[in-house]
Amino acid sequence: MSSRADREKEAQKKWNRYLVAVLIVIIICVVSYVNFVEPFIERTEDQCRKDGVVSIETAFIIDATDHFSESQAERINLEVKDIIESAEIDERFTVYVLDNKFSEANSKNPHIIVCNPGDGQGKSEFTNNIRRLNKNWDEKFYSQITSTIENLVGEGRANQSPILEMIEFASINTMSKSKAKSKRMILISDMLHHNKEYSHYTSSHDFEEFK
């Protein structure tokens, strides 16, 4: 009788150990899954996060009133591509264009605004469609910016080039409103301001007056 009770106790102990082992495995699997699978991030059509998170705020100002040589345009396009390819995930890019329509009200609005959703690098192939992520990155982010700038950097000509006004406008409407911890403004211009109030091409105006 005692032997039978001992056997039953031993069997119960084994069963308890088995349950504990199974429970440990389940806990490990759950923890691994939570750490392995990234939370889903909702994005708008411009690939920016719906929760408003922006890692870096970057503003391009393209002076389309400038005349760039073929070699200068090629250098600019290569530099822009390097910047875009090294962009951080959730970095937001706003492209402003300064052209001969600057005096018109809507000409100061951004040409495009788009965020970097990531190209799939560093993500697991088991939980992500890397090819789809890369295609989305190329079509909705990379090509959006590079093609825009390639089309704008060329044979621009205009009677005015109010670059300082555009810098001020971008600073107020993009930089000051952004909650990003890091911000930068990238200018593609000869930086020669020219309008009736002030011109770098002449010395007849007082810069302090313009300010």
Model-derived features: positions:
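Von Willebrand factor
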Residues: 53-180, 184-186
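DG-centered beta-turn motif at the end of beta-strands
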Residues: 63-64, 170, 182-196
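VWA/integrin I-like adhesion module and closely mimicked acidic/polar interface patches used
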Residues: 192-211
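N-terminal post-signal-peptidase region of extra-cytosolic proteins
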Residues: 75-82, 168, 206-211
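Acidic, polar low-complexity linker/tail segments
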Residues: 2-73, 85
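Surface-exposed acidic, glycine-flexible loop patches that form ligand/cofactor-binding
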Residues: 49-52, 84-87, 173-179
